């Protein structure tokens, strides 16, 4: 088989998926508005909970491979409350060529609350993924966001000897850009993570973003940080708080993240996090 035919087959096998929907407050209850689903990305809405509406993303492709593309576009209307999570940890497989692309857009209107709480993203050795998260909040909207990335299947002793991870975050509040960050790791990622100035040997990293956030939020988290299983840093500026973690044990980092989310919000975590 020629390289052209092989490339055509590879392109045809790439997964595509998109979910876009909005929620709105009606008679004191958050309800789903318009919903669009396509490809291998789906969303399910469990039974309503006391604290707004919950949504669970399901990737029917079973993971993310090279060349895949997934797009998520979510809007919470005035006063609505929405928590988003995933049905399971997302696996990103070895990619011999093009990186997978993931684009996430989150918008919250006045008085709305968004919780973006996916379970872990696990990168297999030589996985390649480029992710972008764009968040646009009204001045008095609130956000609780977390992301955990595990480099290599640590339970199997796998290291990332190669691969690519690009992560772009942009946060706007009241129309102003208040936070922008791009993380890029490629080549022998395991070797880079071993450096003290990067992750000091950690194989998992996590970030929690709390808006609004101040020193009171930081102190609540710091009170619990002595029991954390890895390294952590917590700070607040520009009206939001952020906690960052790295650990050699992905399960321990997940437990630390659950502690932080509980102290930051006081609300119950999605039930899938408790399995």
Where are these regions (language model features)?
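N-terminal intrinsically disordered, cationic/polar leader segments
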Residues: 2-38, 101, 107-116, 128-130, ...
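Short, surface-exposed recognition loops or helix-turn segments adjacent to catalytic cores
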Residues: 119-121, 146-151
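Structural motif
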Residues: 81-83, 113-115, 142-144, 206-207, ...
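Basic (Lys/Arg-enriched) interaction patch that binds polyanionic ligands
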Residues: 126-127, 132-134, 145-148
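Feature marks extracellular polysaccharide-active and adherence modules
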Residues: 77, 136-138, 172
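A structural signal for small-residue-enriched, beta-sheet-centric alpha/beta enzyme cores
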Residues: 149-275
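A short, polar/proline- and glycine-enriched secondary-structure boundary/capping micro-motif
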Residues: 41-45, 93-98, 126-128, 154-158, ...
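N-terminal, charged/glycine-rich beta-strand/loop interface patches
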Residues: 2-120, 125, 132
């Amino acid at each position: 088989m020629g390289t052209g035919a092989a490339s055509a087959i590879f392109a045809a096998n790439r997964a595509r998926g998109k979910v876009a929907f909005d929620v709105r407050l009606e008679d004191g209850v958050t309800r789903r508005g318009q919903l669009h689903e396509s490809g291998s990305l789906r969303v399910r809405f469990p039974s309503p909970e006391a604290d707004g509406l919950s949504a669970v993303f399901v990737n029917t492709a079973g993971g993310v491979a090279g060349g895949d593309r997934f797009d998520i576009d979510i809007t919470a209307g005035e006063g609505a409350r929405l928590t988003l999570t995933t049905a399971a940890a997302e696996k990103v497989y070895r990619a011999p060529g093009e990186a997978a692309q993931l684009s996430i857009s989150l918008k919250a209107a006045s008085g709305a609350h968004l919780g973006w709480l996916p379970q872990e993203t696990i990168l297999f050795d030589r996985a390649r993924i480029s992710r972008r998260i764009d968040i646009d909040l009204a001045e008095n909207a609130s956000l609780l966001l977390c992301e955990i990335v595990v480099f290599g299947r640590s339970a199997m002793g796998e290291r990332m000897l190669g691969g690519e991870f690009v992560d772009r975050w942009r946060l706007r509040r009241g129309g102003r850009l208040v936070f922008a960050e791009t993380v890029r790791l490629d080549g022998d990622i395991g070797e880079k993570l071993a450096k003290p100035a990067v992750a000091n040997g950690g194989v998992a990293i996590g970030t929690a973003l709390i808006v609004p956030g101040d020193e009171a939020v930081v102190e609540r988290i710091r009170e619990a940080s002595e029991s954390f299983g890895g390294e952590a840093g917590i700070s607040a500026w520009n009206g939001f708080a952020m906690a960052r973690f790295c650990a050699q044990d992905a399960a321990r980092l997940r437990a630390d993240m659950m502690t932080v989310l509980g102290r930051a919000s006081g609300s119950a975590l999605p039930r899938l996090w408790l399995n």
